[in-house]
């Protein structure tokens, strides 16, 4: 069997990542008979409770989901590894419910029953790379200037990208 191909799709909020992913899925199935799984990095946000703990321990900015560091990178890494395994086993991909700002119950998760040919992994920060230390010196906006004047949040986000996200994006 051929290896599962991973396509990383990045773009800003509302730019059509999900729409183009679904169109690609239809084309790949109808024209080539390929099974495609689509999921978003958004579905891997840490739980509200996990982010509350981070906001108390590290920076209150981690309470708001979105930035690198607010995703469950261990779960995401395992998910991509599972999708690529030669000896495929059924598993589930989490779903995040933005209306409750928390992970959905497991009965809402995406059930993956067979090895896909293609995986489309989409999100606004998919493929992002860490910044150089010199680029972290000055705040880039009012939020960082006021709420992160010691640069704790920004440095932690960058460290997460450098260590955990890079490992995922290199799969």
Regions found by a protein language model. Name each.
Residues 17:
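Conserved lysine of the Walker
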Residues 26-37:
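Post-Walker A helix-loop "phosphate-sensing" segment adjacent to the P-loop in P-loop NTPases
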Residues 37-40, 44-101:
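Conserved nucleotide-sensing/catalytic segment adjacent to the nucleotide-binding pocket
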Residues 103-171:
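ATP-dependent NMP and nucleoside kinases share a basic, alpha-helical "lid"
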